[in-house]
A protein has these predicted regions:
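Polyanionic, low-complexity intrinsically disordered segments
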Residues: 1-55, 74, 93-96, 100-303
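Structural motif
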Residues: 70-77
Length: 303
């Protein structure tokens, strides 16, 4: 049993069907939706601010999802919300565990889980696409190191600040006085407080995430036989930008050591390779990311 006890959520529901019942219209669905509600920060500011903005109760979401998956239904939407709750509560550790759980869920229950196949393949697909969007947004504001201000979103802000300063007649110093120091130099100073080992550890944690996503997608395409593509494209792109950003603050020799080699799916060559049957390894191999790098926001600004 792992730390988050996700293995117990994969045991069959006691009753006539291992997948339990359809709970789409069960009150627990609405209860989880309500617990996930989180008003944006701007709603607590300004003249028309909401006095008590809603804040998501992720512990409640996690508990409700666990009880439901264990005792009532093997539901894909509930599973996606569960992954989201672990991520929100435990950051990268929770995300790793959640993605591992989702891969096993799809492997074991895809043929019988809810929503049923009769509702159409696009219904299930949409649940995964929405999770992709939610995870991508979370990662953009996820602290890359212990400092909560060191995020991909803050890096974007620093690049925008530099661009604005280059166009401002008043110059960077005046901009800092009026808006605060959001410069690239200030961002680099914040990262500079951490040693190479810490940055390298974080780099590797983020670099491991695509492998977890590969497993989910390989199980999905193994069952659906759809044309292979990246379901979690947004999450992958955000992870790529994060690892590229972290690598900027590592010496070249450490970057070379941390470089992620291309996926190998030969039997026994990887942990994942040992767990997938031969036919499914072909699906896993097809998910190997291209070596062509997409244009980042920084490159676009430079041009």
């Amino acid at each position: 049993m792992n730390k988050f006890e996700t293995d117990t959520l994969l045991l069959p529901v006691i009753g006539e069907s291992p997948a339990g019942e359809d709970i789409e219209y069960d009150p627990v669905y609405s209860e989880i939706r309500e617990a996930r509600q989180n008003d944006p920060d701007y709603m607590s500011q300004g003249e028309w601010a909401v006095s008590e903005p809603r804040r998501a109760d992720w512990r409640k979401v996690r508990k409700l999802c666990e009880v439901t998956l264990r005792n009532k239904s093997k539901d894909l939407q509930i599973s996606c919300w569960y992954v989201e709750s672990l991520t929100q509560l435990y950051s990268l550790e929770g995300l790793h565990c959640g993605l591992e759980y989702l891969a096993k869920f799809i492997s074991q229950y895809w043929t019988i889980c809810w929503p049923s196949h009769e509702e159409g393949p696009e219904i299930r697909y949409s649940k995964l696409v929405r999770l992709d969007m939610d995870l991508s947004e979370y990662l953009k504001s996820c602290p890359l190191l212990d400092d909560k201000e060191i995020t991909l979103a803050e890096w974007y802000k620093a690049l925008a600040f530099e661009h604005g300063a280059s166009l401002s007649e008043e110059g960077k110093e005046k901009l800092i006085e009026s808006e605060g120091d959001h410069s690239v130099e200030a961002f680099k100073k914040s990262v500079g407080k951490y040693n190479t080992r810490k940055i390298s550890e974080q780099f590797l944690k983020f670099s491991d995430l695509p492998d977890k996503i590969d497993e989910i997608e390989s199980f999905y395409f193994f069952h659906t036989h759809e044309d292979i593509h990246h379901i979690f494209a947004k999450t992958r792109h955000t992870i790529s930008e994060i690892t590229e950003l972290l690598s900027r603050f590592l010496p070249q020799d450490v970057q070379d050591t941390n470089a992620v080699s291309p996926l190998s799916v030969e039997s026994g060559s990887r942990e994942t390779g040992r767990t997938l049957p031969a036919e499914q390894q072909a699906y896993y191999a097809a998910l190997t990311p291209s070596t062509d790098k997409e244009m980042t926001r920084e490159k676009a600004i430079e041009q």
